């Protein structure tokens, strides 16, 4: 738990610095922030995946909700890593960097995010229809898909200059959102793992 609190505190500090850094040199310190978040996304996804797979293999049983959560964990981790590298794939480091450059990045991020949103909507429908979630019934899948829709709707609002948020800061918020979702799904997998943790009194 301490590891994840440390990661989340690092992400929050990155968001806090993003706005001030982005108005100076868009490929200076912001690039360093993106690469740091990329390393965190890869490490988090790899660690969570290994821990979950080894734990489930020892238990010998995967339920449908387990598979859905694990898939969501991996997708959120991959999305976070992809968004970290997206500016380096789209913006030429030799070109003059402007607000329009980050707008292009947000449009690409939003387009890819729409694919993730429709996947999450289909998963939420399965969870609601079969009532697979152990302790939240139907409300949690609905809240999850709504927050995802709001996050990517905000991306397009910022890209079209309808909301006053710096484009780089919006990108960092989006990366943090996916990392938070991955951590949350990992904790849900651990909580409903079916493994009994013995206390010192046992």
Range-by-range predicted roles:
Residues 89-152:
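Membrane-proximal helix-loop-helix units in multi-pass membrane proteins
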Residues 168-184:
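Small-residue-rich transmembrane alpha-helices that serve as helix-helix interface/gating elements
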Residues 81-88, 146-163:
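Hydrophobic alpha-helical transmembrane segments in multi-pass integral membrane proteins
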Residues 35-39, 62-80, 131-148, 201-202:
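Juxtamembrane helix-loop boundaries in multi-pass membrane proteins
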Residues 39-58:
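N-terminal signal-anchor/start-transfer transmembrane helix
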Residues 23-44:
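Hydrophobic transmembrane alpha-helical segments in integral membrane proteins
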Residues 193-202:
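Short, highly charged, low-complexity non-transmembrane loops/tails of multi-pass membrane proteins
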Residues 1-18:
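N-terminal secretory/membrane targeting signals
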């Amino acid at each position: 738990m301490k590891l994840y609190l440390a990661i989340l505190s690092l992400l929050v500090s990155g968001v806090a610095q993003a706005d001030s850094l982005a108005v100076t040199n868009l490929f200076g310190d912001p690039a360093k922030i993106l690469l740091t978040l990329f390393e965190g996304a890869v490490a988090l996804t790899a660690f969570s995946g290994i821990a979950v797979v080894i734990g489930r293999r020892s238990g010998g049983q995967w339920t449908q909700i387990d598979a859905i959560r694990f898939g969501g964990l991996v997708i959120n981790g991959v999305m976070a890593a992809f968004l970290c590298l997206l500016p380096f794939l789209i913006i030429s480091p030799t070109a003059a960097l402007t607000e329009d450059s980050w707008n292009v990045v947000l449009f690409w991020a939003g387009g890819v995010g729409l694919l993730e949103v429709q996947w999450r909507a289909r998963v939420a429908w399965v969870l609601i229809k079969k009532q697979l979630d152990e302790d939240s019934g139907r409300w949690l899948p609905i809240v999850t898909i709504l927050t995802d829709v709001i996050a990517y709707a905000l991306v397009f609002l910022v890209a079209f200059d309808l909301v006053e948020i710096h484009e780089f800061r919006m990108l960092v918020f989006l990366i943090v959102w996916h990392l938070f979702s991955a951590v949350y799904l990992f904790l849900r997998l651990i909580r409903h793992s079916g493994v009994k943790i013995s206390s010192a009194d046992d």
